[in-house]
Amino acid sequence: MVLSEEARDLLADLPMHRRQTFELRLQQWGPDLLDAVTALYASPDEVASALVTIAARGFAARSDELHRLDERRLLQPDWFQRPNMFGYACYVDRYASTLKGMGDRLDHLTDLGVTYLHMMPLLKPRPGDNDGGYAVMDFSSVREDLGTNEDLAELATTLRSRGISSVVDLVLNHVAREHDWAVAARAGDAKYRDYFLIYPERDTPDRFERTLPEVFPDFAPGSFTEVDGEWVWTTFNEWQWDLNWANPAVLLEFAEIVVHLANLGIEVLRLDAIAFLWKRLGTNCQNQPEVHAVTQALRATCRLTAPATLFKAEAIVGPRDLMPYLGEGRHAGRVSDIAYHNSLMVHVWSMLASGSTDLARHALAGLPPTPPGGTWVTYVRCHDDIGWAIDDSDASARGVTGVGHRQFLADWYSGEFDGSWAEGLVFQHNKETGDRRISGTAAALTGLGPSRKDVAGGFARIFLAHAVVAAWGGIPVVWSGDEIGSPGDSDWASEDGHSADNRWVHRPRMTDSDRARRFEQGSDAQRVFDGIALIARVRAGLPMLHSEAPTRVLTDADIDDGLLVVQRRHPSGTFVGVFNVTGEHRPLARARLTDLGSGDPREVLSGHDLAEHGLDDPDGMLWVPPYAAWWIV
Protein backbone atom coordinates (compact mmCIF):
# COMPACT_ATOMS: atom_id res chain seq x y z
CA MET A 1 0.00 0.00 0.00
CA VAL A 2 1.06 3.59 -0.61
CA LEU A 3 0.14 6.67 1.37
CA SER A 4 -2.71 8.75 0.03
CA GLU A 5 -2.17 12.45 -0.55
CA GLU A 6 -4.34 13.25 2.47
CA ALA A 7 -2.32 10.93 4.71
CA ARG A 8 0.94 12.49 3.47
CA ASP A 9 -0.38 15.94 4.32
CA LEU A 10 -1.30 14.80 7.83
CA LEU A 11 2.24 13.53 8.41
CA ALA A 12 4.07 16.35 6.63
CA ASP A 13 4.89 18.42 9.73
CA LEU A 14 6.27 15.50 11.72
CA PRO A 15 10.02 14.89 12.14
CA MET A 16 11.60 12.68 9.49
CA HIS A 17 12.01 9.71 11.85
CA ARG A 18 8.29 9.81 12.70
CA ARG A 19 7.25 9.86 9.05
CA GLN A 20 9.57 6.95 8.37
CA THR A 21 8.13 5.06 11.32
CA PHE A 22 4.61 5.36 9.93
CA GLU A 23 5.75 4.27 6.47
CA LEU A 24 7.50 1.22 7.95
CA ARG A 25 4.34 0.31 9.85
CA LEU A 26 2.33 0.66 6.67
CA GLN A 27 4.68 -1.81 4.99
CA GLN A 28 4.18 -4.20 7.92
CA TRP A 29 0.42 -3.94 8.53
CA GLY A 30 -0.92 -2.40 5.33
CA PRO A 31 -1.27 -5.80 3.61
CA ASP A 32 -3.29 -7.10 6.58
CA LEU A 33 -5.59 -4.10 6.32
CA LEU A 34 -6.16 -4.47 2.58
CA ASP A 35 -6.65 -8.23 2.83
CA ALA A 36 -9.31 -7.77 5.51
CA VAL A 37 -11.39 -5.13 3.73
CA THR A 38 -11.13 -7.06 0.46
CA ALA A 39 -12.92 -9.93 2.19
CA LEU A 40 -15.67 -7.59 3.38
CA TYR A 41 -16.48 -4.83 0.91
CA ALA A 42 -16.95 -4.15 -2.79
CA SER A 43 -14.54 -1.16 -2.86
CA PRO A 44 -11.60 -2.36 -0.76
CA ASP A 45 -9.01 0.13 -2.04
CA GLU A 46 -11.24 3.06 -1.13
CA VAL A 47 -11.98 1.68 2.34
CA ALA A 48 -8.33 0.83 2.98
CA SER A 49 -7.21 4.31 1.96
CA ALA A 50 -9.74 5.87 4.33
CA LEU A 51 -8.51 3.67 7.19
CA VAL A 52 -4.88 4.65 6.54
CA THR A 53 -5.91 8.30 6.63
CA ILE A 54 -7.63 7.77 9.99
CA ALA A 55 -4.50 6.04 11.29
CA ALA A 56 -2.22 8.81 10.01
CA ARG A 57 -4.34 11.48 11.68
CA GLY A 58 -4.15 9.60 14.97
CA PHE A 59 -0.42 8.99 14.59
CA ALA A 60 0.24 12.69 14.04
CA ALA A 61 -1.78 13.58 17.16
CA ARG A 62 -0.25 10.89 19.39
CA SER A 63 1.79 12.21 22.32
CA ASP A 64 5.54 11.74 22.61
CA GLU A 65 5.04 9.67 25.76
CA LEU A 66 2.73 7.27 23.93
CA HIS A 67 5.08 7.05 20.94
CA ARG A 68 7.78 5.94 23.39
CA LEU A 69 5.36 3.39 24.82
CA ASP A 70 4.83 2.04 21.29
CA GLU A 71 8.57 1.56 20.88
CA ARG A 72 8.89 -0.20 24.24
CA ARG A 73 6.07 -2.58 23.44
CA LEU A 74 7.47 -3.38 20.00
CA LEU A 75 10.80 -4.23 21.65
CA GLN A 76 8.96 -6.48 24.14
CA PRO A 77 6.15 -8.02 22.07
CA ASP A 78 5.50 -10.64 24.76
CA TRP A 79 4.95 -8.07 27.52
CA PHE A 80 1.35 -9.17 28.10
CA GLN A 81 2.26 -12.87 28.13
CA ARG A 82 4.74 -12.66 31.00
CA PRO A 83 3.98 -14.27 34.37
CA ASN A 84 4.02 -10.94 36.21
CA MET A 85 0.75 -10.05 34.49
CA PHE A 86 -2.06 -10.17 37.04
CA GLY A 87 -5.40 -8.51 36.46
CA TYR A 88 -8.28 -6.86 38.28
CA ALA A 89 -11.67 -5.83 36.91
CA CYS A 90 -14.11 -3.36 38.45
CA TYR A 91 -16.71 -0.70 37.83
CA VAL A 92 -15.02 2.64 38.51
CA ASP A 93 -18.08 4.12 40.21
CA ARG A 94 -18.47 1.10 42.49
CA TYR A 95 -14.77 0.94 43.36
CA ALA A 96 -13.88 4.61 43.75
CA SER A 97 -16.80 6.82 42.55
CA THR A 98 -14.73 8.67 39.91
CA LEU A 99 -11.66 8.33 37.73
CA LYS A 100 -9.78 10.70 40.02
CA GLY A 101 -10.87 8.61 42.98
CA MET A 102 -9.57 5.53 41.19
CA GLY A 103 -6.16 7.11 40.93
CA ASP A 104 -6.20 7.79 44.67
CA ARG A 105 -6.96 4.16 45.56
CA LEU A 106 -4.33 2.19 43.70
CA ASP A 107 -2.39 0.94 46.74
CA HIS A 108 -5.02 -1.76 47.25
CA LEU A 109 -4.35 -3.00 43.73
CA THR A 110 -0.57 -2.80 43.78
CA ASP A 111 -0.53 -4.65 47.11
CA LEU A 112 -2.59 -7.37 45.43
CA GLY A 113 -0.03 -7.59 42.62
CA VAL A 114 -2.15 -6.04 39.87
CA THR A 115 -0.46 -5.08 36.59
CA TYR A 116 -3.58 -5.02 34.39
CA LEU A 117 -6.73 -3.05 35.28
CA HIS A 118 -9.98 -3.55 33.40
CA MET A 119 -12.29 -0.63 34.14
CA MET A 120 -15.79 -1.69 33.20
CA PRO A 121 -17.81 0.39 30.69
CA LEU A 122 -16.99 4.02 31.25
CA LEU A 123 -18.01 5.59 27.95
CA LYS A 124 -21.22 7.61 28.07
CA PRO A 125 -24.25 5.26 28.24
CA ARG A 126 -27.93 5.95 27.78
CA PRO A 127 -29.74 7.25 30.89
CA GLY A 128 -31.59 4.72 33.01
CA ASP A 129 -31.25 1.02 32.31
CA ASN A 130 -28.15 0.56 30.18
CA ASP A 131 -27.05 -3.07 30.54
CA GLY A 132 -24.36 -2.17 33.05
CA GLY A 133 -22.94 0.50 30.75
CA TYR A 134 -22.96 -1.55 27.54
CA ALA A 135 -25.63 0.61 25.87
CA VAL A 136 -23.35 3.44 24.75
CA MET A 137 -24.76 6.68 23.38
CA ASP A 138 -21.44 8.52 22.90
CA PHE A 139 -18.14 6.72 22.25
CA SER A 140 -16.17 9.97 22.32
CA SER A 141 -16.96 10.90 25.93
CA VAL A 142 -16.51 9.41 29.37
CA ARG A 143 -19.52 9.05 31.65
CA GLU A 144 -20.03 12.50 33.14
CA ASP A 145 -20.34 11.20 36.71
CA LEU A 146 -16.92 9.53 36.39
CA GLY A 147 -15.03 12.48 34.96
CA THR A 148 -13.70 13.60 31.60
CA ASN A 149 -11.55 12.30 28.79
CA GLU A 150 -8.69 14.24 30.33
CA ASP A 151 -9.26 12.44 33.64
CA LEU A 152 -9.12 9.10 31.83
CA ALA A 153 -5.88 10.01 30.06
CA GLU A 154 -4.38 11.19 33.35
CA LEU A 155 -5.41 7.97 35.09
CA ALA A 156 -3.91 5.87 32.29
CA THR A 157 -0.64 7.75 32.74
CA THR A 158 -0.73 7.26 36.52
CA LEU A 159 -1.43 3.56 36.09
CA ARG A 160 1.53 3.18 33.73
CA SER A 161 3.79 4.88 36.25
CA ARG A 162 2.80 2.16 38.71
CA GLY A 163 3.28 -0.68 36.25
CA ILE A 164 -0.42 -1.18 35.49
CA SER A 165 -1.90 -1.37 31.99
CA SER A 166 -5.36 0.14 31.47
CA VAL A 167 -8.19 -1.81 29.83
CA VAL A 168 -11.44 -0.27 28.55
CA ASP A 169 -14.54 -1.72 26.88
CA LEU A 170 -15.46 -0.97 23.30
CA VAL A 171 -18.93 -2.25 22.41
CA LEU A 172 -18.91 -3.23 18.75
CA ASN A 173 -22.23 -4.95 18.12
CA HIS A 174 -24.66 -2.22 19.06
CA VAL A 175 -25.28 1.32 20.27
CA ALA A 176 -27.94 2.81 22.49
CA ARG A 177 -31.04 3.97 20.65
CA GLU A 178 -30.21 7.45 22.01
CA HIS A 179 -26.90 7.49 20.08
CA ASP A 180 -26.77 10.23 17.42
CA TRP A 181 -26.62 7.60 14.67
CA ALA A 182 -29.79 5.91 15.88
CA VAL A 183 -31.57 9.23 16.42
CA ALA A 184 -30.75 10.24 12.84
CA ALA A 185 -31.85 6.85 11.53
CA ARG A 186 -35.17 7.13 13.32
CA ALA A 187 -35.61 10.60 11.82
CA GLY A 188 -35.33 9.06 8.36
CA ASP A 189 -31.73 9.94 7.42
CA ALA A 190 -30.87 7.36 4.76
CA LYS A 191 -27.15 7.44 5.55
CA TYR A 192 -27.69 6.49 9.16
CA ARG A 193 -30.53 4.07 8.51
CA ASP A 194 -27.90 2.01 6.71
CA TYR A 195 -25.84 1.93 9.93
CA PHE A 196 -28.49 -0.41 11.35
CA LEU A 197 -30.57 -3.43 10.34
CA ILE A 198 -34.09 -2.08 9.83
CA TYR A 199 -36.83 -4.06 8.09
CA PRO A 200 -40.14 -2.59 6.87
CA GLU A 201 -42.02 -5.85 7.43
CA ARG A 202 -41.84 -8.82 9.75
CA ASP A 203 -41.10 -11.53 7.16
CA THR A 204 -37.29 -11.19 7.18
CA PRO A 205 -37.00 -10.97 10.99
CA ASP A 206 -39.16 -14.08 11.27
CA ARG A 207 -36.84 -16.00 8.95
CA PHE A 208 -33.79 -14.93 10.95
CA GLU A 209 -35.40 -15.78 14.29
CA ARG A 210 -35.90 -19.42 13.32
CA THR A 211 -32.21 -19.98 14.09
CA LEU A 212 -31.44 -17.16 16.56
CA PRO A 213 -31.00 -17.96 20.27
CA GLU A 214 -32.34 -15.47 22.81
CA VAL A 215 -29.76 -13.70 24.97
CA PHE A 216 -32.15 -12.39 27.62
CA PRO A 217 -35.28 -14.55 27.34
CA ASP A 218 -36.72 -13.26 30.62
CA PHE A 219 -36.75 -9.50 30.04
CA ALA A 220 -35.82 -9.09 26.35
CA PRO A 221 -37.29 -11.99 24.37
CA GLY A 222 -36.66 -12.10 20.65
CA SER A 223 -34.05 -10.32 18.55
CA PHE A 224 -36.12 -7.58 16.89
CA THR A 225 -38.03 -4.57 18.19
CA GLU A 226 -40.87 -2.72 16.47
CA VAL A 227 -40.01 0.96 16.06
CA ASP A 228 -42.33 3.33 14.18
CA GLY A 229 -43.91 0.46 12.26
CA GLU A 230 -40.59 -1.12 11.26
CA TRP A 231 -38.42 -3.84 12.80
CA VAL A 232 -34.98 -3.03 14.20
CA TRP A 233 -32.45 -5.76 15.03
CA THR A 234 -31.90 -5.68 18.80
CA THR A 235 -30.02 -8.80 19.92
CA PHE A 236 -29.69 -7.79 23.57
CA ASN A 237 -32.33 -5.22 24.55
CA GLU A 238 -34.87 -3.11 22.70
CA TRP A 239 -32.75 -0.02 23.43
CA GLN A 240 -29.54 -1.56 22.02
CA TRP A 241 -29.62 -1.32 18.24
CA ASP A 242 -27.39 -3.76 16.35
CA LEU A 243 -25.03 -2.21 13.82
CA ASN A 244 -24.76 -3.12 10.16
CA TRP A 245 -21.10 -4.07 9.76
CA ALA A 246 -21.70 -4.89 6.10
CA ASN A 247 -21.69 -1.10 5.65
CA PRO A 248 -18.04 0.09 5.45
CA ALA A 249 -19.04 3.42 6.98
CA VAL A 250 -19.56 1.60 10.29
CA LEU A 251 -16.02 0.21 10.12
CA LEU A 252 -14.63 3.69 9.48
CA GLU A 253 -16.55 5.13 12.43
CA PHE A 254 -15.14 2.49 14.75
CA ALA A 255 -11.62 2.92 13.42
CA GLU A 256 -11.88 6.57 14.54
CA ILE A 257 -13.09 5.42 17.97
CA VAL A 258 -10.26 2.89 18.35
CA VAL A 259 -7.64 5.51 17.51
CA HIS A 260 -9.25 8.01 19.89
CA LEU A 261 -9.15 5.58 22.83
CA ALA A 262 -5.61 4.47 22.03
CA ASN A 263 -4.49 8.10 22.07
CA LEU A 264 -5.96 8.52 25.54
CA GLY A 265 -3.39 5.94 26.61
CA ILE A 266 -5.62 2.86 26.81
CA GLU A 267 -3.44 -0.23 26.38
CA VAL A 268 -6.08 -2.93 25.87
CA LEU A 269 -9.48 -2.59 24.19
CA ARG A 270 -12.00 -5.23 25.21
CA LEU A 271 -14.10 -5.86 22.11
CA ASP A 272 -17.52 -6.49 23.61
CA ALA A 273 -20.08 -8.77 21.95
CA ILE A 274 -17.68 -9.35 19.08
CA ALA A 275 -19.17 -12.74 18.21
CA PHE A 276 -22.46 -11.14 17.10
CA LEU A 277 -21.19 -8.63 14.51
CA TRP A 278 -22.05 -10.36 11.24
CA LYS A 279 -25.53 -11.58 10.35
CA ARG A 280 -26.22 -14.50 8.03
CA LEU A 281 -29.63 -16.04 7.38
CA GLY A 282 -29.94 -19.65 8.47
CA THR A 283 -27.27 -19.39 11.18
CA ASN A 284 -27.23 -18.28 14.82
CA CYS A 285 -25.49 -15.10 13.60
CA GLN A 286 -22.51 -15.71 15.85
CA ASN A 287 -18.89 -16.54 14.98
CA GLN A 288 -19.32 -15.78 11.28
CA PRO A 289 -16.04 -15.64 9.29
CA GLU A 290 -16.48 -11.94 8.54
CA VAL A 291 -16.15 -11.16 12.26
CA HIS A 292 -12.47 -12.01 12.04
CA ALA A 293 -11.97 -9.89 8.93
CA VAL A 294 -13.55 -6.92 10.74
CA THR A 295 -11.22 -7.47 13.70
CA GLN A 296 -8.21 -7.74 11.41
CA ALA A 297 -9.07 -4.44 9.71
CA LEU A 298 -9.46 -2.62 13.03
CA ARG A 299 -6.30 -4.17 14.46
CA ALA A 300 -4.19 -3.25 11.43
CA THR A 301 -5.48 0.33 11.62
CA CYS A 302 -4.67 0.48 15.32
CA ARG A 303 -1.18 -0.94 14.74
CA LEU A 304 -0.42 1.88 12.32
CA THR A 305 -1.25 4.47 14.97
CA ALA A 306 -0.67 2.76 18.30
CA PRO A 307 0.96 -0.69 18.30
CA ALA A 308 1.08 -0.56 22.10
CA THR A 309 -2.70 -1.02 22.18
CA LEU A 310 -3.91 -4.62 22.13
CA PHE A 311 -7.30 -6.17 21.38
CA LYS A 312 -9.11 -8.54 23.73
CA ALA A 313 -12.02 -10.52 22.29
CA GLU A 314 -15.06 -10.84 24.52
CA ALA A 315 -16.24 -14.00 22.80
CA ILE A 316 -18.10 -16.11 25.34
CA VAL A 317 -18.70 -18.93 22.91
CA GLY A 318 -18.31 -22.68 22.80
CA PRO A 319 -14.79 -24.09 23.01
CA ARG A 320 -14.80 -25.17 19.36
CA ASP A 321 -15.60 -21.62 18.22
CA LEU A 322 -13.16 -19.81 20.48
CA MET A 323 -9.73 -20.27 18.90
CA PRO A 324 -10.43 -18.25 15.71
CA TYR A 325 -10.71 -15.13 17.88
CA LEU A 326 -6.99 -15.49 18.65
CA GLY A 327 -6.25 -16.10 14.98
CA GLU A 328 -6.35 -19.20 12.83
CA GLY A 329 -5.55 -19.76 9.16
CA ARG A 330 -5.35 -16.53 7.17
CA HIS A 331 -6.07 -14.52 10.34
CA ALA A 332 -3.27 -16.07 12.44
CA GLY A 333 -1.50 -13.30 14.34
CA ARG A 334 -3.81 -10.68 12.84
CA VAL A 335 -6.88 -10.44 15.07
CA SER A 336 -7.22 -10.26 18.85
CA ASP A 337 -4.20 -10.69 21.10
CA ILE A 338 -6.21 -11.86 24.12
CA ALA A 339 -9.40 -13.87 24.60
CA TYR A 340 -11.42 -15.10 27.57
CA HIS A 341 -10.93 -18.72 28.61
CA ASN A 342 -14.59 -19.19 29.43
CA SER A 343 -14.29 -22.98 29.30
CA LEU A 344 -11.68 -23.04 32.05
CA MET A 345 -13.87 -20.90 34.30
CA VAL A 346 -16.90 -23.13 33.76
CA HIS A 347 -14.94 -26.31 34.41
CA VAL A 348 -13.38 -24.94 37.60
CA TRP A 349 -16.89 -24.50 38.99
CA SER A 350 -17.95 -27.86 37.56
CA MET A 351 -15.07 -29.66 39.27
CA LEU A 352 -15.77 -28.04 42.63
CA ALA A 353 -19.46 -28.97 42.53
CA SER A 354 -19.00 -32.54 41.31
CA GLY A 355 -15.76 -33.35 43.12
CA SER A 356 -14.62 -34.92 39.86
CA THR A 357 -12.07 -33.80 37.28
CA ASP A 358 -13.03 -36.35 34.63
CA LEU A 359 -15.16 -34.10 32.41
CA ALA A 360 -12.85 -31.11 32.85
CA ARG A 361 -9.77 -33.13 31.93
CA HIS A 362 -11.39 -34.35 28.74
CA ALA A 363 -12.74 -30.94 27.70
CA LEU A 364 -9.67 -28.86 28.57
CA ALA A 365 -7.19 -31.35 27.11
CA GLY A 366 -9.10 -31.21 23.84
CA LEU A 367 -8.56 -27.49 23.31
CA PRO A 368 -5.72 -26.52 20.96
CA PRO A 369 -2.89 -24.36 22.33
CA THR A 370 -3.06 -20.60 21.89
CA PRO A 371 -1.17 -19.12 18.92
CA PRO A 372 2.38 -17.93 19.73
CA GLY A 373 1.38 -14.27 19.92
CA GLY A 374 -1.88 -14.73 21.80
CA THR A 375 -2.94 -15.45 25.34
CA TRP A 376 -5.93 -16.08 27.57
CA VAL A 377 -7.60 -14.04 30.21
CA THR A 378 -8.34 -16.62 32.89
CA TYR A 379 -10.80 -15.90 35.65
CA VAL A 380 -12.95 -17.34 38.41
CA ARG A 381 -15.70 -14.71 38.31
CA CYS A 382 -16.49 -11.61 36.31
CA HIS A 383 -19.20 -8.95 36.12
CA ASP A 384 -21.49 -11.32 34.25
CA ASP A 385 -23.53 -14.35 35.18
CA ILE A 386 -22.13 -17.85 34.69
CA GLY A 387 -23.57 -19.68 31.71
CA TRP A 388 -22.93 -23.39 31.93
CA ALA A 389 -21.08 -23.83 28.64
CA ILE A 390 -20.67 -27.59 28.90
CA ASP A 391 -20.22 -29.04 25.43
CA ASP A 392 -22.66 -31.88 24.75
CA SER A 393 -20.05 -33.96 22.93
CA ASP A 394 -17.58 -33.58 25.80
CA ALA A 395 -20.24 -34.64 28.28
CA SER A 396 -21.35 -37.68 26.29
CA ALA A 397 -17.73 -38.76 25.84
CA ARG A 398 -17.49 -39.04 29.63
CA GLY A 399 -20.78 -40.85 30.12
CA VAL A 400 -23.00 -37.94 31.15
CA THR A 401 -25.43 -35.71 29.28
CA GLY A 402 -24.78 -32.06 28.66
CA VAL A 403 -28.35 -31.18 29.63
CA GLY A 404 -28.17 -33.21 32.82
CA HIS A 405 -24.83 -31.78 33.93
CA ARG A 406 -25.91 -28.21 33.21
CA GLN A 407 -29.04 -28.87 35.26
CA PHE A 408 -26.92 -30.22 38.11
CA LEU A 409 -24.62 -27.18 38.10
CA ALA A 410 -27.57 -24.77 38.14
CA ASP A 411 -29.13 -26.71 41.02
CA TRP A 412 -25.85 -26.83 42.94
CA TYR A 413 -24.91 -23.17 42.63
CA SER A 414 -28.42 -21.91 43.31
CA GLY A 415 -28.31 -23.90 46.55
CA GLU A 416 -31.19 -26.16 45.51
CA PHE A 417 -29.10 -29.34 45.48
CA ASP A 418 -28.98 -31.14 48.82
CA GLY A 419 -25.60 -30.56 50.48
CA SER A 420 -24.66 -27.54 48.39
CA TRP A 421 -22.66 -24.80 50.08
CA ALA A 422 -23.53 -22.26 47.36
CA GLU A 423 -25.93 -19.30 47.54
CA GLY A 424 -26.16 -18.12 43.95
CA LEU A 425 -29.21 -16.65 42.23
CA VAL A 426 -30.78 -18.04 39.07
CA PHE A 427 -30.43 -15.59 36.18
CA GLN A 428 -32.42 -15.93 32.94
CA HIS A 429 -34.21 -19.25 33.23
CA ASN A 430 -34.87 -20.34 29.65
CA LYS A 431 -37.94 -22.52 29.96
CA GLU A 432 -37.58 -23.87 26.43
CA THR A 433 -34.04 -25.21 26.89
CA GLY A 434 -34.06 -25.53 30.68
CA ASP A 435 -30.85 -23.52 30.91
CA ARG A 436 -30.40 -21.47 34.07
CA ARG A 437 -27.45 -19.15 34.47
CA ILE A 438 -26.12 -18.17 37.89
CA SER A 439 -25.27 -14.88 39.58
CA GLY A 440 -23.13 -14.57 42.69
CA THR A 441 -19.69 -13.64 44.00
CA ALA A 442 -16.90 -16.18 44.39
CA ALA A 443 -17.51 -16.18 48.15
CA ALA A 444 -21.25 -16.77 47.77
CA LEU A 445 -20.63 -19.70 45.41
CA THR A 446 -17.98 -21.41 47.56
CA GLY A 447 -19.53 -21.39 51.04
CA LEU A 448 -18.74 -17.87 52.32
CA GLY A 449 -22.09 -16.40 51.32
CA PRO A 450 -24.51 -14.59 53.63
CA SER A 451 -25.40 -17.84 55.45
CA ARG A 452 -21.73 -18.93 55.72
CA LYS A 453 -22.63 -22.52 54.93
CA ASP A 454 -19.03 -23.80 54.89
CA VAL A 455 -16.49 -21.26 56.11
CA ALA A 456 -13.36 -23.42 56.16
CA GLY A 457 -14.22 -25.02 52.84
CA GLY A 458 -15.07 -21.65 51.36
CA PHE A 459 -11.64 -20.19 52.05
CA ALA A 460 -9.97 -23.28 50.62
CA ARG A 461 -12.11 -23.33 47.48
CA ILE A 462 -11.56 -19.63 46.74
CA PHE A 463 -7.79 -20.08 47.00
CA LEU A 464 -7.87 -23.28 44.95
CA ALA A 465 -9.97 -21.77 42.17
CA HIS A 466 -7.69 -18.75 41.81
CA ALA A 467 -4.61 -20.97 41.94
CA VAL A 468 -5.94 -23.09 39.07
CA VAL A 469 -6.63 -20.16 36.74
CA ALA A 470 -3.33 -18.48 37.64
CA ALA A 471 -1.45 -21.67 36.73
CA TRP A 472 -2.82 -21.70 33.17
CA GLY A 473 -0.57 -19.00 31.77
CA GLY A 474 -2.28 -15.97 30.31
CA ILE A 475 -3.54 -13.10 32.44
CA PRO A 476 -5.50 -14.15 35.53
CA VAL A 477 -8.08 -11.48 36.38
CA VAL A 478 -9.74 -11.08 39.79
CA TRP A 479 -13.25 -9.65 39.92
CA SER A 480 -13.73 -6.69 42.26
CA GLY A 481 -14.86 -7.76 45.71
CA ASP A 482 -13.71 -11.34 45.32
CA GLU A 483 -10.26 -10.43 46.65
CA ILE A 484 -11.81 -9.51 50.02
CA GLY A 485 -14.33 -12.34 50.13
CA SER A 486 -17.40 -10.17 49.56
CA PRO A 487 -20.59 -12.24 49.94
CA GLY A 488 -22.36 -9.87 47.53
CA ASP A 489 -24.67 -6.88 47.69
CA SER A 490 -27.76 -7.82 49.69
CA ASP A 491 -29.45 -4.58 48.55
CA TRP A 492 -28.74 -5.08 44.86
CA ALA A 493 -32.39 -4.67 43.83
CA SER A 494 -32.88 -1.31 45.55
CA GLU A 495 -30.80 0.76 43.12
CA ASP A 496 -32.57 2.41 40.20
CA GLY A 497 -32.62 0.19 37.13
CA HIS A 498 -31.25 -2.87 38.92
CA SER A 499 -34.31 -4.64 40.26
CA ALA A 500 -34.82 -6.85 37.19
CA ASP A 501 -31.15 -7.83 36.89
CA ASN A 502 -29.76 -9.91 39.75
CA ARG A 503 -26.24 -9.79 38.30
CA TRP A 504 -25.87 -6.69 40.46
CA VAL A 505 -25.65 -9.00 43.47
CA HIS A 506 -22.06 -9.74 42.47
CA ARG A 507 -21.22 -6.13 41.62
CA PRO A 508 -21.00 -4.72 45.16
CA ARG A 509 -19.79 -1.23 45.92
CA MET A 510 -16.43 -1.16 47.69
CA THR A 511 -15.74 1.52 50.29
CA ASP A 512 -12.46 2.54 51.87
CA SER A 513 -13.64 0.70 54.98
CA ASP A 514 -14.18 -2.46 52.93
CA ARG A 515 -10.65 -2.23 51.57
CA ALA A 516 -9.24 -1.56 55.04
CA ARG A 517 -10.67 -4.82 56.37
CA ARG A 518 -7.87 -6.71 54.69
CA PHE A 519 -5.62 -5.37 57.44
CA GLU A 520 -7.80 -6.93 60.18
CA GLN A 521 -6.05 -10.14 61.14
CA GLY A 522 -8.29 -13.17 60.83
CA SER A 523 -11.03 -11.40 58.88
CA ASP A 524 -12.45 -12.87 55.69
CA ALA A 525 -10.94 -9.97 53.77
CA GLN A 526 -7.46 -10.53 55.20
CA ARG A 527 -7.45 -14.26 54.59
CA VAL A 528 -8.75 -14.09 51.03
CA PHE A 529 -6.69 -11.03 50.02
CA ASP A 530 -3.44 -12.43 51.37
CA GLY A 531 -4.06 -15.72 49.62
CA ILE A 532 -4.67 -14.16 46.22
CA ALA A 533 -1.75 -11.74 46.67
CA LEU A 534 0.46 -14.74 47.41
CA ILE A 535 -0.65 -16.37 44.16
CA ALA A 536 0.26 -13.22 42.21
CA ARG A 537 3.62 -12.85 43.95
CA VAL A 538 4.72 -16.46 43.44
CA ARG A 539 3.44 -16.50 39.87
CA ALA A 540 5.53 -13.47 38.91
CA GLY A 541 8.69 -15.43 39.70
CA LEU A 542 7.86 -18.53 37.67
CA PRO A 543 8.93 -18.25 34.00
CA MET A 544 7.15 -21.56 33.35
CA LEU A 545 3.90 -19.58 33.59
CA HIS A 546 4.78 -17.44 30.57
CA SER A 547 1.92 -17.76 28.09
CA GLU A 548 4.06 -19.34 25.40
CA ALA A 549 4.52 -22.47 27.53
CA PRO A 550 1.51 -24.69 26.73
CA THR A 551 -0.60 -26.25 29.46
CA ARG A 552 -0.83 -30.02 29.20
CA VAL A 553 -3.77 -31.55 31.04
CA LEU A 554 -3.10 -35.12 32.15
CA THR A 555 -5.95 -37.46 31.26
CA ASP A 556 -4.36 -40.77 32.32
CA ALA A 557 -6.82 -43.17 33.90
CA ASP A 558 -4.50 -43.95 36.82
CA ILE A 559 -4.68 -40.37 38.13
CA ASP A 560 -7.26 -40.06 40.88
CA ASP A 561 -10.57 -38.63 39.69
CA GLY A 562 -10.41 -35.93 42.38
CA LEU A 563 -7.11 -34.52 41.12
CA LEU A 564 -6.47 -32.14 38.25
CA VAL A 565 -2.82 -32.44 37.21
CA VAL A 566 -1.28 -30.10 34.64
CA GLN A 567 2.22 -29.70 33.27
CA ARG A 568 3.95 -26.72 31.66
CA ARG A 569 7.37 -27.14 30.03
CA HIS A 570 9.63 -24.12 29.62
CA PRO A 571 13.37 -23.79 28.88
CA SER A 572 13.84 -22.73 32.51
CA GLY A 573 12.26 -25.92 33.85
CA THR A 574 9.02 -27.81 34.34
CA PHE A 575 5.97 -26.73 36.32
CA VAL A 576 3.44 -29.24 37.62
CA GLY A 577 0.13 -28.13 39.09
CA VAL A 578 -1.72 -30.57 41.33
CA PHE A 579 -5.21 -29.53 42.42
CA ASN A 580 -7.50 -31.53 44.69
CA VAL A 581 -11.11 -30.54 43.99
CA THR A 582 -12.51 -32.66 46.83
CA GLY A 583 -12.80 -32.39 50.59
CA GLU A 584 -10.76 -35.58 51.12
CA HIS A 585 -7.10 -36.61 50.82
CA ARG A 586 -6.39 -38.03 47.38
CA PRO A 587 -3.40 -40.17 46.26
CA LEU A 588 -0.82 -39.28 43.63
CA ALA A 589 2.00 -41.63 42.67
CA ARG A 590 5.43 -40.16 43.37
CA ALA A 591 6.59 -41.64 40.08
CA ARG A 592 4.15 -39.32 38.32
CA LEU A 593 6.19 -36.27 39.33
CA THR A 594 9.38 -37.93 38.15
CA ASP A 595 7.77 -38.78 34.81
CA LEU A 596 6.67 -35.16 34.44
CA GLY A 597 10.18 -33.84 34.95
CA SER A 598 10.10 -33.05 38.68
CA GLY A 599 13.05 -35.11 39.86
CA ASP A 600 13.56 -33.06 43.02
CA PRO A 601 10.09 -31.57 43.49
CA ARG A 602 9.41 -28.47 45.57
CA GLU A 603 5.97 -27.06 46.29
CA VAL A 604 6.30 -23.27 45.99
CA LEU A 605 2.76 -21.91 46.45
CA SER A 606 1.08 -23.34 49.52
CA GLY A 607 4.18 -23.88 51.65
CA HIS A 608 3.61 -27.63 51.86
CA ASP A 609 6.63 -29.81 52.60
CA LEU A 610 6.01 -32.72 50.26
CA ALA A 611 7.94 -35.02 52.59
CA GLU A 612 5.14 -34.57 55.11
CA HIS A 613 2.67 -35.79 52.51
CA GLY A 614 4.43 -39.03 51.61
CA LEU A 615 7.14 -37.91 49.18
CA ASP A 616 9.66 -40.38 50.59
CA ASP A 617 7.27 -43.09 51.77
CA PRO A 618 8.09 -46.65 50.67
CA ASP A 619 4.73 -47.09 48.96
CA GLY A 620 5.64 -44.27 46.59
CA MET A 621 2.35 -42.47 47.15
CA LEU A 622 1.80 -38.79 47.91
CA TRP A 623 -1.42 -37.81 49.67
CA VAL A 624 -2.82 -34.50 48.47
CA PRO A 625 -4.82 -32.69 51.20
CA PRO A 626 -8.44 -31.55 50.71
CA TYR A 627 -8.74 -28.62 48.29
CA ALA A 628 -4.95 -28.36 48.08
CA ALA A 629 -3.34 -26.31 45.32
CA TRP A 630 0.22 -27.45 44.73
CA TRP A 631 2.55 -25.62 42.36
CA ILE A 632 5.53 -27.93 41.98
CA VAL A 633 8.84 -27.01 40.32
Please report, for each region that a protein language model flagged, where it lies by residue.
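Active-site and adjacent substrate-binding regions of carbohydrate-active enzymes
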Residues: M1-V633
